[in-house]
């Protein structure tokens, strides 16, 4: 039984399931993966295969959404106003992807205003990132491998079956090794905030409303856990590994700021980037009912220009251990 396909799970059951998964799959390597049907070129890798663990599901066991269905956000009656959504707007086409859906599917392959995009969410990292899914002129479709590295979702493209790290957007195994996906300036915000900014926007709805228990959180209490699951790396210093941080990774700089600090200051400038925080967004990883989760607020990130112009930039509200795992030489600003 997969911890990421359970209809609901208690913290104790989740811990047991993860310990079983870690024990069962710690020795997985290319020979076994090939027996599972993978056509990946495992001779090309930038990582140690021992870093890869299985979260339980097989390839595509967590099904991506490849033919997304939307309805006008004004017609929504299912998603609560404070529930978290990943929002992305391109050339006036604004779309909201509720975490109540993404928590069960993790990947949505979509096209917005002619741009092929993939919208992703890794629950164990609380990492919500959108990418342009074009690489060297080729449009890729992404699926779930069922595997994790540093507790983070490992995706694969269906053209070459190369494996991609969701948190970085980089191909880590296979023919596409060394290629990177361009991150897009998506925002994790409440549905109410999205609706205010984009009253004519669209919201993703389930292809099959009975396929999963949409609106329910299968990781109850995870963001209050003492330590992360399926992670054996070093922990960040001076901050709880499960504390939320705002991670900025653009062409000029990579840094992280503790969400608690931003929440206290409301507005904070760092390395030329302005961050803001406002209340009104539920945690998707707190209570069983996502709509009842505690308020963790909404972050925006932008670069200020001339005449009060602002340019949104990609950011991520993730856990401190995740940023540390992928950027061990970077410090997290806590004061």
Q: Where are the predicted features?
A:
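Mid-to-C-terminal functional-domain signal that highlights helix-capping/loop sites
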Residues: 27-335
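Bacterial N-terminal signal peptides
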Residues: 11-22
């Amino acid at each position: 039984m997969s911890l990421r396909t359970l209809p609901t799970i208690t913290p104790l059951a989740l811990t047991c399931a993860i310990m079983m998964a870690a024990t069962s799959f710690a020795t997985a390597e290319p020979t076994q993966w090939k027996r599972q049907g993978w056509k990946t070129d495992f001779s090309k890798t930038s990582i140690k295969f021992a870093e890869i663990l299985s979260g339980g599901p097989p390839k595509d066991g967590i099904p991506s959404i490849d033919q997304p269905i939307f309805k006008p956000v004004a017609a929504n009656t299912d998603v609560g106003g404070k529930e978290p959504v990943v929002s992305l707007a391109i050339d006036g086409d604004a779309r909201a992807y509720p975490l109540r859906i993404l928590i069960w599917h993790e990947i949505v392959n979509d096209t917005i205003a002619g741009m092929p995009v993939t919208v992703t969410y890794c629950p164990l990292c609380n990492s919500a990132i959108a990418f342009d899914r074009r690489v060297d002129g080729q449009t890729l479709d992404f699926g779930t491998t069922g595997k994790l590295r540093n507790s983070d979702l490992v995706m694969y493209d269906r053209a070459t079956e190369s494996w991609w790290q969701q948190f970085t957007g980089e191909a880590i195994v296979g023919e596409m090794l060394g290629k990177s996906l361009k991150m897009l300036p998506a925002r994790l915000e409440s549905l109410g905030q999205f609706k205010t900014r984009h009253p004519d926007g669209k919201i993703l709805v389930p292809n099959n409303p009975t396929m999963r228990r949409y609106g329910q959180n299968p990781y109850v209490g995870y963001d209050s856990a003492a330590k992360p699951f399926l992670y054996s790396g070093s922990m960040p210093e001076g901050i709880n590994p499960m504390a939320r941080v705002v991670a900025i990774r653009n062409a000029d700089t990579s840094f992280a700021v503790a969400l608690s600090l931003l929440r206290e200051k409301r507005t904070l400038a760092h390395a030329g980037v302005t961050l803001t925080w406002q209340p009104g967004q539920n945690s998707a990883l707190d209570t069983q009912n996502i709509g009842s989760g505690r308020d963790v607020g909404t972050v925006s990130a932008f670069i200020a220009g001339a005449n009060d112009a602002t340019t949104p930039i990609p950011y991520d509200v993730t856990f401190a251990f995740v940023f540390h795992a992928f950027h061990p030489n970077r410090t997290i600003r806590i004061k």
